[in-house]
UniProtKB/Swiss-Prot annotation:
Keyword flag Chaperone: no
Organism whose genome encodes this protein: Thermotoga maritima (strain ATCC 43589 / DSM 3109 / JCM 10099 / NBRC 100826 / MSB8)
Family, similarity comment: Belongs to the universal ribosomal protein uL11 family.
Protein name: Large ribosomal subunit protein uL11
Pfam families, alphabetized: Ribosomal_L11, Ribosomal_L11_N
PTM comment, free text: One or more lysine residues are methylated.
Keywords from the named record: Methylation, Ribonucleoprotein, Ribosomal protein, RNA-binding, rRNA-binding
Function: Forms part of the ribosomal stalk which helps the ribosome interact with GTP-bound translation factors.
Subunit structure comment from the entry: Part of the ribosomal stalk of the 50S ribosomal subunit. Interacts with L10 and the large rRNA to form the base of the stalk. L10 forms an elongated spine to which 3 L12 dimers bind in a sequential fashion forming a heptameric L10(L12)2(L12)2(L12)2 complex.
Alphabetized PANTHER family for the sequence: 60S RIBOSOMAL PROTEIN L12 (PTHR11661), LARGE RIBOSOMAL SUBUNIT PROTEIN UL11M (PTHR11661:SF1)
Classification via InterPro entries: Ribosomal_uL11 (IPR000911), Ribosomal_uL11_bac-typ (IPR006519), Ribosomal_uL11_C (IPR020783), Ribosomal_uL11_C_sf (IPR036769), Ribosomal_uL11_CS (IPR020785), Ribosomal_uL11_N (IPR020784), Ribosomal_uL11_N_sf (IPR036796)
Entry's Gene Ontology BP terms: translation
GO cellular component, one term: cytosolic large ribosomal subunit
Length: 141
């Protein structure tokens, strides 16, 4: 018989740097998960992706065991890295804070493809372009 799911927790953590301090500790602690075990397993799996922010979905079962799925970095994080900026525009569509090329958009779309709700690379690129536009990043050819 399959284990019963008690909770599903979604967090965004820096790769290889999960610690029992907030936000990880309180989020997992209230569901009775062994926080240190999660931190060790997460850090071991993400050690090669240092410097990235990774969304993780943790499924906690009634017997306090857990599994987790690591997703691809957020599109906004990848766009900021590609454009070489710290943060998006405070006034998107009015203030342009950076530029990315179609080639960079294509690379980001390929990276994000498993997590995007898109059937083709073109559709994925449109999603990423929309994110760029809403962050005040201009897409140039």
């Amino acid at each position: 018989m399959a284990k019963k799911v008690a909770a599903q927790i979604k967090l965004q953590l820096p790769a290889g740097k999960a610690t029992p301090a907030p936000p990880v500790g309180p989020a997992l602690g209230q569901h009775g998960v062994n926080i240190m075990e999660f931190c060790k397993r997460f850090n071991a799996e993400t050690a090669d992706k240092a410097g990235m922010i990774l969304p993780v979905v943790i499924t906690v079962y009634e017997d306090k065991s857990f599994t987790f799925i690591i997703k691809t970095p957020p599109a906004s994080f990848l766009l900021k890295k590609a454009a070489g900026i710290e943060k998006g525009s405070s006034e998107p569509k009015r203030k342009i804070v950076g530029k990315v090329t179609r080639k960079q958009i294509e690379e980001i779309a390929k990276t994000k493809m498993p997590d995007l709700n898109a059937n083709s690379l073109e559709a994925a690129m449109k999603i990423i372009e929309g994110t760029a536009k809403s962050m005040g990043i201009e897409v140039v050819d």
